[in-house]
């Protein structure tokens, strides 16, 4: 009967009360229990008062109670019903995790990298195209400007009258002047013959008869000096040798052959424009002047240049498709 009464009394006590009674029977204080269990005094007090701290998980609280029971020699099986009430197991709240696998993150990163790479590539291509278009447009404008200038200069040259016939008429006048003294001498020689008459009657008869004979004499005498005589100090013209001799070749001659239409401007050392204008396909140009020559060529691929008998290299202008600006020195060293 006494054993059953004691068992019923123990069941009536809570877990904290039973632990406190056992501690007091052993003569231990809350400080001593806390030191042995490595707990705070407040935690031991909460356990004896059947309080569950909010910041303490139920799993840890059940472990502390079991350690406390072993310390005060109380069987753990007797405390299990009370533990279910004092420290019930609470399901931990687990937040649903987002399924971001490593493969998906890597794929997303690679996608952004590819997008950025394509964007940079498009920007580079766009800038290159814009630069090429501006350079091409500037070259076309420059060629058009130079062509307009050359056409304007040609129009101005055509509008000015060139006295080409003056020299020829002067030469003709110089060629005909030596014959006039011969004619005067011929007439002078005829007049004394007419005046030396013995009597006036004969003179009158001669005046009536002589003019036809004088006309015959004059017509016969006049062509003879023109054909046989030359003025004093005048040298005969070498007409036969003029058609045979050829001018000497200038070592500074500039020879150009054109395979296509090309605009061209050539200036010598004195600043004189030897040529400025458009040359057609299959045309050729031979210029002489004072070296060095300054050349501007609109289409370098359409012209072949020979200077001092050697070809001039225009490959660097052909590769870049630019207007060629170069200077040909006396030693044939083209410089841009």
Swiss-Prot record:
Topological domains (Periplasmic): residue ranges?
133-336
Give the Pfam families listed for this entry. HTH_25, RodZ_C
| Species the sequence originates in | Escherichia coli O7:K1 (strain IAI39 / ExPEC)
| Keyword field | Cell inner membrane, Cell membrane, Cell shape, DNA-binding, Membrane, Signal-anchor, Transmembrane, Transmembrane helix
**Highest taxon, organism lineage:** Bacteria
Its ancestry begins with:
Bacteria, Pseudomonadati, Pseudomonadota, Gammaproteobacteria, Enterobacterales
**Chain intervals with Polar residues compositional bias:** 148-164, 202-217
**Which Gene Ontology terms of cellular component type are present?**
plasma membrane
Belongs to which family? Belongs to the RodZ family.
Chain's gene name: rodZ
- Region: Disordered, residue numbers: 148-245
Protein name per its UniProtKB record: Cytoskeleton protein RodZ
Q: Offer an example of a GO molecular function term for this protein.
A: DNA binding
Query: Where is the secretion signal located?
Result: none
Matches recorded under InterPro entries: Bact_Cytoskel_RodZ, Cro/C1-type_HTH, Lambda_DNA-bd_dom_sf, RodZ, RodZ-like_C
One of the GO biological process terms = regulation of cell shape
Here the segments flagged for biased composition (Low complexity) are: 165-201, 218-240
> Cytoplasmic side of the membrane: what ranges?
1-111
Residues in the DNA-binding region are 30-49
* Topology versus the membrane: Single-pass type II membrane protein
């Amino acid at each position: 009967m006494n054993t059953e009464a004691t068992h019923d009394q123990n069941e009536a006590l809570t877990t904290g009360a039973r632990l406190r009674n056992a501690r007091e029977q052993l003569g231990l204080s809350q400080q001593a229990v806390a030191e042995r269990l490595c707990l705070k005094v407040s935690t031991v007090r909460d356990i004896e008062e059947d309080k569950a701290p909010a910041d303490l998980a139920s799993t840890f609280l059940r472990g502390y109670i079991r350690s406390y029971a072993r310390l005060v020699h109380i069987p753990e099986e007797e405390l299990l019903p009370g533990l279910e009430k004092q420290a019930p197991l609470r399901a931990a709240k687990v937040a649903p995790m987002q399924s971001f696998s490593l493969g998906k993150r890597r794929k997303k990163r690679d996608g952004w990298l590819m997008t950025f790479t394509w964007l940079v590539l498009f920007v580079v291509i766009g800038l290159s195209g814009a630069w090429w278009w501006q350079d091409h447009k500037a070259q076309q404008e420059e060629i058009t400007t130079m062509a307009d200038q050359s056409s304007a200069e040609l129009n101005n040259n055509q509008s000015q009258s060139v006295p080409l016939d003056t020299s020829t008429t002067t030469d003709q006048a110089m060629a005909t002047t030596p014959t006039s003294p011969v004619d005067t001498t011929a007439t002078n020689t005829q007049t004394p013959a007419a005046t030396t008459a013995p009597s006036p009657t004969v003179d009158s008869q001669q005046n009536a008869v002589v003019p036809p004979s004088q006309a015959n004499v004059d017509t016969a005498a006049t062509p003879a000096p023109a054909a046989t005589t030359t003025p004093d100090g005048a040298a005969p013209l070498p007409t036969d040798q003029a058609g045979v001799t050829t001018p000497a070749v200038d070592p500074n001659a500039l020879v150009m052959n054109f395979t296509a239409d090309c605009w061209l401007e050539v200036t010598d050392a004195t600043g004189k424009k030897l040529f400025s204008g458009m040359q057609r396909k299959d045309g050729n140009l031979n210029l002489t002047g004072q070296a060095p020559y300054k050349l501007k060529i609109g289409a370098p691929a359409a012209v072949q240049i020979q200077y001092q008998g050697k070809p001039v290299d225009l490959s660097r202008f052909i590769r870049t498709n630019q207007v060629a600006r170069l200077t040909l020195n006396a030693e044939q060293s083209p410089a841009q």
